[in-house]
Amino acid sequence: MVCIPCIVIPVLLWIFKKFLEPYIYPVVSRIWPKKAVQQSGDKNMSKVDCKGAGTNGLPTKGPTEVSDKKKD
């Protein structure tokens, strides 16, 4: 059996999105400061260099070899 909040919460979210948000959003967008919506000034955060990362995510210094031989 499904719990009551699992049914009620999605229905309330759908009602808010469909009927209430079109009326509330224009009012809030005038009051809310524009700075809170914009991205931060640090543009280096979006640049990622993956050349030195191995398959496990750790940086590698040189070529690695995978040995198929079992070591005892």
Swiss-Prot record:
Q: Which domain of life is it from?
A: Eukaryota
Region named Disordered: 36-72
List every stretch annotated Necessary for its localzation to the endoplasmic reticulum and lipid droplets.
1-33
Q: Does the keyword Endoplasmic reticulum apply?
A: yes
* Alphabetic keyword roster: Endoplasmic reticulum, Lipid droplet
Localization, per the record, is: Endoplasmic reticulum; Lipid droplet
Kinase as a keyword of this entry, yes or no, is no
GO terms under cellular component:
endoplasmic reticulum; lipid droplet
Share the record's PTM remark: Undergoes ER-associated degradation (ERAD).
**Function text:** May activate the NF-kappa-B signaling pathway.
Q: Which family does it belong to?
A: Belongs to the UPF0729 family.
Subunit details: Interacts with DERL1 and AMFR.
This chain's protein is named UPF0729 protein C18orf32 homolog
